From Swiss-Prot:
Maturation propeptide residues: 158-162
UniProt biased composition (Basic and acidic residues): 1-27
Species of the source: Colletotrichum higginsianum (strain IMI 349063)
Gene ablation phenotype (knockout): Abrogates mitophagy.
Protein's cellular compartments: Cytoplasmic vesicle, Autophagosome membrane; Vacuole membrane
Protein name as annotated: Autophagy-related protein 8
Length: 162
């Protein structure tokens, strides 16, 4: 699935934007995935405090609750009937789980508890317990962003009947 953000912005512009964000928030984003500072992410786990404000949008000036963050572009699957999220670019704490990120997305789009939401990375449902930092390292785009799509339906999976 092609990202609408990728379609609207050429690679050079996306890469420059990722670098601008990295520099602006250098205290929150490690400079390199192999830097000594980035290895601190896997330290002793702290109990997460989950609130709708746990994830900062790029425009927010409020500090993050975690030491490092990953850059995420989050978009609705084009034909999904679920609400559209207000912002696309996020700095997500690296030690946040996928399940916690889904909770934040649910809150931002004001999705009622009885409605389902599915998120996809490269058209695959990531494990709920996976850390956002590990998903980022495995699936980040060459421009520096992790592209996540969400839908009200499991559009890429399901059961086939014979």
């Amino acid at each position: 699935m092609r990202s609408k953000f990728k379609d609207e912005h050429p690679f050079e512009k996306r890469k420059a934007e990722a670098e601008r964000i990295r520099q602006k928030y250098s205290d929150r984003i490690p400079p390199s995935p192999h830097s000594p500072a980035s290895r601190l992410i896997g330290g002793a786990p702290r109990p997460p405090v989950i609130t709708a404000d746990l994830v900062s949008t790029v425009e927010d000036s409020a500090p993050l609750t975690k030491a490092f963050a990953v850059q995420v572009i989050c978009e609705k699957v084009e034909k999904s009937d679920i609400a559209t999220i207000d912002k696309k670019k996020y700095l997500v704490p690296a030690d946040l789980t996928v399940g916690q990120f889904v909770y934040v997305i649910r809150k931002r789009i004001k999705l009622s508890p009885e409605k389902a939401i599915f998120i996809f990375v490269d058209e695959v449902l990531p494990p709920t317990a996976a850390l956002m930092s590990s998903i980022y390292e495995e699936h980040k785009d060459e421009d520096g962003f992790l592209y996540i799509t969400y839908s009200g339906e499991n559009t890429f999976g399901g059961f086939e009947t014979a």
